[in-house]
Amino acid sequence: MLKRRLEFFFLYMMLIGAYVIWFFPVSRLEFYGGLLCYISIILFSIYSLILENRTSQHTLLWIHILVFFPIVGYVFYLFSGQLYVKGKLFKTKRMYNREKLRKLFDKEETPEVTGLKDNQERFFTYSIRAAHMNINTKSNIKVLKNGEETFPDIFKAMRKAESYIHIEYYMFKSDMLGRGMMDIMMEKARQGVEVRFLYDAAGSMKLARRDIMRMKQAGVDIVPFSPLKYGFFNQKLNFRNHRKIVIIDGKTGFVGGLNVGKEYISRDPYIGFWRDTHLRLEGEIVQTLHAIFMLDWEYVSNEVLIDQEEYNTPVPVEGGGIYQIVATGPDMKESMSDLYYEMISSAQKSIWIATPYFVPNESIRTALKAAATKGVEVRVMVPEKNDSFLTQYASRSYFPELLLEGIEVYSYQKGFMHQKVMIIDGDLASVGTANMDMRSFQLNFEVNVFFTDAEAIRTLEAHFEEDMQESEKLSPVGFYKRGVADRTKESFARLFSGVL
């Protein structure tokens, strides 16, 4: 790793040196020498890019960035654009995960994918093979609406913990909500409960060092995912752990869109109301979610938990359908994009999507438009206001082609909508951490739950319909009348859609 960092550092210094000599030459020889060196480094980067065999869209995007923004663009390319880096850095973890999960699931009796509706059978047949993750039937889930429902439920379950509490979050802040959860962690640790806390170093930069030390002193085992100590020369910098997982005694689990911060309970006056969806899990499915945590924990701490029987004893309950946990990211071969595509393609009646970041790749857009052409009701809901300028306008750039195909687009007005929900035909759904953008599809560690639980899906549908009442339905005519300034912003932002 150190050798690779030094190689990138010296190559970057050479690029800057060549750039300076070219622009401020002392002699004609230095001018042409600097220019030649500068062009050679850029061409070498473009050659490496072409060898990655990515889509033509992404290849051309990065070529343009490297040519027109060479110094800054080269940094972005080295640490976010290189797909082969992902393959090399996480190859060992990917193989290890596959083997550990195979051994874990081989102990279980896998339910047959039979007796399901056509769309359900098609999706789960694909997802089992593609994701290599078991399905469960002896499980159930409860849909939790917003932070006001979710965090009291999480805190109550944590206080009842007897053996262990395992927590994994992308964003965890030292504010009123974060300290409330930390107090429970420290209290349970002092009582002898094992408490392990994994946080993403980039997402949780507002987790105070003094709070980390307080938790450690209380007995909480806490580690960061991908620390930022090497700055831009950390090749793993751009691969972030976007998962949100809580496991209590192997009996109860929580997963969904909510991080830990006061904005997630609508207490940030700048953001205002926060709309999100989370799930409470019970039964065998908790073991699968726990396995994802244990593999992530082992990766950053070197403590092996997944082989210990006490952490791998499923607690079955009476189920209400088919359930599957799917983790994606640099450590997994499959992409959430593939699973979303299969869900959309399986639809026969309706597709309802709620996502905060809508920057779909070509395959997702094609599937949505094809479904609408077949007469499937397609609804896409996004927030009116976004916390990212580029993402907001890049999302809007896709609306004209969707509206033209008869797809209904809703702009959520009440506040910021952060949920990641998809409902197919009213009998197949997904809730989790993955957005519909390139970061979730290519770079982030994500986890979603796919299920057929009729009661949970009815709840999601009711919530979606309530959200529609708080949304503006975009009309093709009205949207096409937007001003030149908005069109320009959308076109500019779309240039970066491949890296958002």
From Swiss-Prot:
PLD phosphodiesterase domain segment(s): 237-264, 413-440
GO cellular component: plasma membrane
BP GO annotations: cardiolipin biosynthetic process
Residues spanning the signal sequence: none
Transmembrane segments: 6-26, 31-51, 59-79
Subcellular location field: Cell membrane
GO molecular function list: cardiolipin synthase activity
Induction: By heat shock.
EC number(s) from the headed UniProt entry: 2.7.8.-
Active site residues of this protein: H242, K244, D249, H418, K420, D425
InterPro entries (UniProt xref): Cardiolipin_synth_Firmi, Cardiolipin_synthase, CLS_N, PLD-like_dom, PLipase_D/transphosphatidylase
EC top class named in words: transferase
Major localization listed first in the record, in broad terms: membrane
One Pfam family here: PLDc_N
Catalysed transformations (reactions): 2 a 1,2-diacyl-sn-glycero-3-phospho-(1'-sn-glycerol) = a cardiolipin + glycerol
Membrane topology qualifier: Multi-pass membrane protein
This protein's UniProt keywords: Cell membrane, Lipid biosynthesis, Lipid metabolism, Membrane, Phospholipid biosynthesis, Phospholipid metabolism, Repeat, Transferase, Transmembrane, Transmembrane helix
Matching HAMAP family: Cardiolipin_synth_Cls
Annotated function: Catalyzes the reversible phosphatidyl group transfer from one phosphatidylglycerol molecule to another to form cardiolipin (CL) (diphosphatidylglycerol) and glycerol. May have a role in the heat shock response since the level of the transcript of ywiE increases after a heat shock.
UniProt family annotation: Belongs to the phospholipase D family. Cardiolipin synthase subfamily.
Name under which the protein is recorded: Probable cardiolipin synthase YwiE
Organism lineage: Bacteria, Bacillati, Bacillota, Bacilli, Bacillales
